[in-house]
């Protein structure tokens, strides 16, 4: 007597292409938003609404309108038609009057003079912090990350990397289910997909990824002296804001120490580091002494990848510069990299940068920030992603 199967499944033969129009429009809009984010990253990274909201806000960016292709009347009223000269390229406007720009009477307004032609339609789309992070963080990584004393950790991410015969219907693997049914039916002499039985069902299942990873610590040092004005402090905090989010998003075992300094340095909380201001003179070596103290007390270089970052306006007491250079070299002996960012929007003479420009150690990286967009460029400079080795 042939074995009976419970037959509860069918394969839909409906033409699903009829239902894809909305999805295609949505995907096209999503692609345009991603392009707009990528093209506006330098401005978005320094957007004050995001920095001051602690990452819980959205911003609006302009996105070019997506017009459907259609034939329309030529409002520019070109008087001639004929064969092209073969030099046209994708994106060229067809049938535009070549003399229009010379006549000075047509064209879009440029902000100084009025024009009589329609402009390009733009609309504003809200962008969340997560979308900006996705575009920014894929370009970055911790430099010179080395394998230290290993710590086994379980990542929060799960991967669907196994297939089983039992599972949740929401996780059914349609492709493998159909292949299983097709093979079984073929063995029975019927080269077709249906019928599909319970025994043919295959389900995707997941596993938590266990990996061995090295620990890292970032020592963030910021000049909070009186010479650090509103713009300088905003730029420094903007950089540290994105650095903080980047490292905590991409790495599981990164720790942070925050040091604020004027003539004296002290370890502060993350909240105080990003919110409180101080005054006084500037002795940058005080921050480096404190960083070495923190490293010696808490972070053994054999167990930690150490990344000190210092942001200042460069207005240091000249007599302190030689001490700073010696301490920077001492810190680099214990760290993977030393990053120095200087906020100098007016191209003024900087005593500290003048001293640091002679440091030739490859571990030493510096960047001068002159405008808000440089926060993005500084991030890319310090956390430049190395090409994968083939």
Swiss-Prot record:
Q: Which NCBIfam families match?
A: spore_yhbH
Q: List the protein's name.
A: UPF0229 protein OB2647
The record's comment on protein family reads: Belongs to the UPF0229 family.
- Give the residue spans that cross the bilayer: none
User: What is the organism of origin for this protein?
Assistant: Oceanobacillus iheyensis (strain DSM 14371 / CIP 107618 / JCM 11309 / KCTC 3954 / HTE831)
Region entry Disordered, spans? 99-121
* Family annotation (Pfam families): DUF444
């Amino acid at each position: 007597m042939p074995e009976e199967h419970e037959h509860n499944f069918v394969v839909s033969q409906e033409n699903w292409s009829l239902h894809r129009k909305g999805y295609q429009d949505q995907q096209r809009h999503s692609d345009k938003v991603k392009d707009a984010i990528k093209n506006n990253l330098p401005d978005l990274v320094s957007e004050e609404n995001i920095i001051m909201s602690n990452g819980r806000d959205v911003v609006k960016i302009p996105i070019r309108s997506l017009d459907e292709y259609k034939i329309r009347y030529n409002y520019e009223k070109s008087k001639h038609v004929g064969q092209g000269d073969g030099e046209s390229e994708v994106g060229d406007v067809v049938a535009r009057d070549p003399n229009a720009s010379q006549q000075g009477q047509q064209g879009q307004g440029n902000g100084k003079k009025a024009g009589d032609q329609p402009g390009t339609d733009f609309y504003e789309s809200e962008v969340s912090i997560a979308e900006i992070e996705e575009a920014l963080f894929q370009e970055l990584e911790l430099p010179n990350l080395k394998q230290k004393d290993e710590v086994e950790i379980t990542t929060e991410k799960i991967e669907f990397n196994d297939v089983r015969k039992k599972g949740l219907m929401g996780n059914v693997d349609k492709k493998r289910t159909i292949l299983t049914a097709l093979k079984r039916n073929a063995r029975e002499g019927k080269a077709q997909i249906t019928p599909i039985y319970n025994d043919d069902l295959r389900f995707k299942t997941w596993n938590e990824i266990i990996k061995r990873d090295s620990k890292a610590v970032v020592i963030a040092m910021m000049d909070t002296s009186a010479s650090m004005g509103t713009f300088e402090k905003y730029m420094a905090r903007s950089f540290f804001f994105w650095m903080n989010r980047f490292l905590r998003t991409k790495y599981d075992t990164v720790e942070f120490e925050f040091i604020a300094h004027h003539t004296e340095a002290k370890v502060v909380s993350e909240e105080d580091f990003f919110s409180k201001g101080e005054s006084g003179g500037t002795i940058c070596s005080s921050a480096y002494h404190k960083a070495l103290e923190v490293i010696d007390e808490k972070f053994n270089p054999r167990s930690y990848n150490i990344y000190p970052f210092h942001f200042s306006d460069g207005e240091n007491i000249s007599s302190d510069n030689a001490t700073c250079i010696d301490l920077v070299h001492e810190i680099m002996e214990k760290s993977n990299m030393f990053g120095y960012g200087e906020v100098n929007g007016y191209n003024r003479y900087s005593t500290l940068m003048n001293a640091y420009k002679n440091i030739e150690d490859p571990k030493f990286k510096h960047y001068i920030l002159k405008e808000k967009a440089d926060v993005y460029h500084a991030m890319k400079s310090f956390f430049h992603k190395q090409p994968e080795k083939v």
